[in-house]
């Protein structure tokens, strides 16, 4: 491809609304163009990389015994009502009506459609197992699209669905997909982590996320350096500090003028934060909830939402807190009625806590769960953090940031039961099909690759997913010798099926080098009068600072060998 014919332009300025590195570099390199919030066009360079990623995905899916199909984007809302997932997805669903006033949604995922297909075409154990996948656009009305391709409203996704006759069959499908996903990321030249994850609105009994480690990632990865445990912070469990049990003392009300934050109250009363209880107020599907937790811990809102089995959870506003009769800054569950109290299990680990007196400017000493208040629900609703104790060894948690690029779920039978997707076993007994689902964000993977592979000058593409393998930088192309040499190398490489972007523009060396670094093509060949006078071509890998002069008569062989070594991942 001649750069002079390439559709798209680079830009020097960093767009003001681009926060993540991948968003900045994708826009600056002219690889994507925004149409509206969370909706992008893939320009030719980016689309070449997308196609390479999809090819790797297809190869690994097919190797794992999957069959590709294509399902409709338009879905009748009735199948979402049948599955019971219309409410959990809520406003994320794009709703529309056709000319006959029928309600439809744009598919955010395809569990409903594939389960409907399974109910029609799988009748016997002889029809199992099945593994079906597609690569297709999905639509989700994200409230705050951000990060370029990281969180968008229209995106490309590979979704695969497994159908098995037994839990052991599901385990096999799950492990096969786990290995296939790891192969995809490895072949794309990326470092990934597999972590425990929350199933969210998709549902299911177990799930894992695949993370590309990157400093600007939107997800927090909690892991133990001493053992193999790793999880999304939303899911992570940890060993909470054990407090000594004391003889229960009588409640005592004390004045705490102006002390509202836990840290201030603890300091004022000369106690440690873990010897206090704090209350956080939420609205769960419109119902007021008080969440109570030990003062040294924070609420994990995902765990809380799962415990409450609600579709919408948010912090209560000031007016809602007042309407509930709660005094912010001095609140506790002691003496409260007609309010749903949810407590973290840490409140049972300790005694004689300091908590709010439900009276402005006052707190209670010697508050004890069971004696002074009872929780309507009690479970682990605490957020793990760096420094938390690992529950599986004596290690201490560390944390990384990451970009989620894949999520796999053991769905079980809850969808097949709702859609009547059953099979008959060898004895003629009917059973619901056991399902798994496996998603991979293709556009996210592209962005994550940049998050993990860049420097201050631009992108550094891994060879397997680079839009082009070689960047020929011709300098002083008005010189006939340079022009002839550049054209000759370009044609010889293309004849060997090497993917080449030939910068044939009449621009300065500085502009060309800057664009080469920004675009991040893995291998750059610089052809100039000075290099030709020395009998060679400047050969440079994008990820290296050093370059070398390679003789003209061996440059093609050197390029081929380098591409092979860089692609063998």
Swiss-Prot record:
Classification via CDD domains = ProRS-INS (cd04334), ProRS_anticodon_short (cd00861), ProRS_core_prok (cd00779)
Q: Which Gene3D superfamilies match?
A: Anticodon-binding domain, Bira Bifunctional Protein, Domain 2
> Which of the seven top EC classes does this enzyme belong to?
ligase
Cellular compartments annotated: Cytoplasm
Q: Does the keyword section mention Endoplasmic reticulum?
A: no
Q: What is its EC number?
A: 6.1.1.15
Catalytic activities? tRNA(Pro) + L-proline + ATP = L-prolyl-tRNA(Pro) + AMP + diphosphate
GO-annotated biological processes: prolyl-tRNA aminoacylation
Where is it predominantly found?
Answer: cytoplasm
Which of UniProt's keywords are assigned here? Aminoacyl-tRNA synthetase, ATP-binding, Cytoplasm, Ligase, Nucleotide-binding, Protein biosynthesis
Q: Which InterPro entries match?
A: aa-tRNA-synt_IIb (IPR002314), aa-tRNA-synth_II (IPR006195), aa-tRNA-synth_II/BPL/LPL (IPR045864), Anticodon-bd (IPR004154), Anticodon-bd_dom_sf (IPR036621), Pro-tRNA-ligase_IIa (IPR002316), Pro-tRNA-synth_IIa_bac-type (IPR004500), Pro-tRNA-Synthase_IIa_type1 (IPR023717)
GO MF terms, alphabetically ordered:
aminoacyl-tRNA deacylase activity; ATP binding; proline-tRNA ligase activity
Pfam families reported for this sequence: HGTP_anticodon (PF03129), tRNA-synt_2b (PF00587), tRNA_edit (PF04073)
CC per GO annotation = cytosol
Give the SUPFAM superfamilies listed for this entry.
Class II aaRS ABD-related, Class II aaRS and biotin synthetases, YbaK/ProRS associated domain
Q: What is known of its domains?
A: Consists of three domains: the N-terminal catalytic domain, the editing domain and the C-terminal anticodon-binding domain.
What family classification does the UniProt entry report for this protein? Belongs to the class-II aminoacyl-tRNA synthetase family. ProS type 1 subfamily.
General function of this protein: Catalyzes the attachment of proline to tRNA(Pro) in a two-step reaction: proline is first activated by ATP to form Pro-AMP and then transferred to the acceptor end of tRNA(Pro). As ProRS can inadvertently accommodate and process non-cognate amino acids such as alanine and cysteine, to avoid such errors it has two additional distinct editing activities against alanine. One activity is designated as 'pretransfer' editing and involves the tRNA(Pro)-independent hydrolysis of activated Ala-AMP.
Instruction: Cite the record's note on assembly.
Output: Homodimer.
**Protein's recorded name:** Proline--tRNA ligase
Lineage of the species this protein comes from: Bacteria, Bacillati, Chloroflexota, Dehalococcoidia, Dehalococcoidales
